Amino acid sequence: MLKVAVFDEEHEKDLQTEINSFLKGISEEQLIDIKYTVSAACDPDGEQLYCFSALILYRK
């Protein structure tokens, strides 16, 4: 069965930590693909906001 896990963090290091923790729980044979994206925006006060996201496709 194919499954997905979605991760979304405000900081790259937090995303890295979450993904590494998840990957410890599956084997290399189960991992199919990882998709990664970054979004950036400004709030009304001009502060930059970032969203680091990853989708992991794996076999259960």
Curated annotation (Swiss-Prot):
Induction (free text): Transcription starts around hour 2 of sporulation and requires sigma-E.
Keywords on record: Sporulation
InterPro entries: Spore_Cse60 (IPR020296)
GO BP annotation list: sporulation resulting in formation of a cellular spore
Pfam families referenced in this protein's UniProt entry, alphabetically: Spore_Cse60
Name assigned to this protein: Sporulation protein cse60
